[in-house]
């Protein structure tokens, strides 16, 4: 809520102050609320979609930059979101949890605005995520390329998961 209030304060001081942030001007991502300058320059989120339906999907969704910051804050040992003054460079993401005989599997792709954004996250939050341990599970956090864009793929799944050989893929719609 506080970030939304800060966005409205920014709005009232910006060149957009004579309009309202509703309808077609409504922000379309938490990134735009967290970084109003990105909103102002039209940095819209990318739509990331899994390319296969999958019969054992438990849940599928987008995290967004706010949730990514919350995860990073938790991994860093803080109870609140990551208070980084540097914008993450989040472009879009999609995660899926999958039912397996040995427990749930998570596959999560994040597309970044630039390779430096991806590399910065891999060296911080990604490194902490990779270090997590869970008996009977394997963790991978790696750089991938999606349609010419810098991305990361996170997989946390049981050691025996058959998807390790061919994990679900995604495509970038925009």
Where are the regions that the model predicts?
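Generic low-polarity alpha-helical segments
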Residues: 1-12, 71, 76, 152-154
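Short, compositionally biased low-complexity segments enriched in polar/charged residues
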Residues: 45-106, 121-122
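Amphipathic alpha-helical substructures
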Residues: 1-66, 103, 117-118
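Compositionally biased, intrinsically disordered low-complexity regions
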Residues: 6, 25, 44, 56, ...
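Generic secondary-structure transition motif, activating predominantly at the C-termini of alpha-helices
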Residues: 15, 75, 79, 126-129, ...
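C-terminal soluble interaction/assembly domains
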Residues: 91-174
């Amino acid at each position: 809520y506080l970030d939304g209030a800060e966005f409205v304060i920014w709005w009232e001081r910006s060149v957009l102050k004579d309009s309202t942030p509703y309808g077609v001007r409504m922000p379309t991502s938490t990134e735009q609320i967290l970084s109003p300058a990105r909103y102002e320059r039209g940095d819209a989120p990318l739509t990331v979609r899994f390319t296969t339906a999958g019969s054992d999907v438990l849940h599928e969704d987008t995290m967004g930059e706010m949730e990514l910051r919350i995860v990073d804050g938790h991994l860093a040992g803080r109870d609140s979101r990551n208070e980084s003054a540097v914008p993450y460079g989040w472009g879009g993401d999609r995660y899926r949890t999958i039912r397996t005989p040995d427990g749930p599997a998570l596959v999560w792709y994040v597309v970044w605005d630039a390779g430096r954004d991806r590399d910065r996250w891999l060296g911080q939050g990604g490194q902490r995520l990779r270090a997590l341990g869970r008996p009977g599970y394997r963790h991978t956090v790696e750089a991938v390329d999606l349609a010419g864009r810098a991305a990361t793929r996170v997989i946390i799944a049981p050691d025996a998961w058959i998807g390790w050989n061919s994990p679900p893929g995604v495509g970038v719609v925009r």
